Amino acid sequence: MASIHTFILQPGAREIALCAKWRLEAFGDVLGASLQDEIKRLEDFVAGGQGQVALMARCDGVPAGTCLLTPTELEPCHPVSPWLAGLYVVPEYRRRGIGRLLISATEEQARQRGNSHIYLYTDDAIAFYEGLGWRVIEQTMWMDHPMALMARDLRA
């Protein structure tokens, strides 16, 4: 059985560049940044303070995914916080529980910071998140694209 673990990226971590590359692969149309710009954004995010965290997952020591806990999300966003954002698992590591582990670790980071709820937007993974205890709060539109606003009660 594979060994999977998550950890918080620290300022100056060499993995930041890899996470930035993954973020551009998955969300480049939304991020609208060059690789160097996204590396800088992620470095600033990691150094940004207590309310935000960048997590990485490793599978048998190999980088396999990332996820963010962030106080804000897509603009204009709903006036709630914090957000689970930027979940990405490397294609060859999908369907091994890495996404679930990253979500759980992100939820725990939110809980440790005293939050009772956490939120996310998704366009195509509603059933996946519902299976993890999340619920749809609202169907909305973002840039003419349907999205679901979802929440998870961290007290449960």
Predicted regions and their residues:
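A short beta-loop-alpha structural element at the N-terminal edge
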Residues: 2-19
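Conserved GNAT-fold acetyl-CoA-binding loop/helix
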Residues: 24-44
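Short loop/turn motifs at secondary-structure junctions and domain boundaries
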Residues: 45-50
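Conserved beta-strand in the GNAT
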Residues: 54-56, 62-72, 83, 88
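Conserved acetyl-CoA pyrophosphate-binding loop and the N-cap/start of the following alpha-helix
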Residues: 93, 97-105
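C-terminal "cap" of GNAT-fold acetyltransferases
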Residues: 116-125, 138-156
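Conserved acetyl-CoA-binding loop of GNAT-fold acetyltransferases
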Residues: 130-140
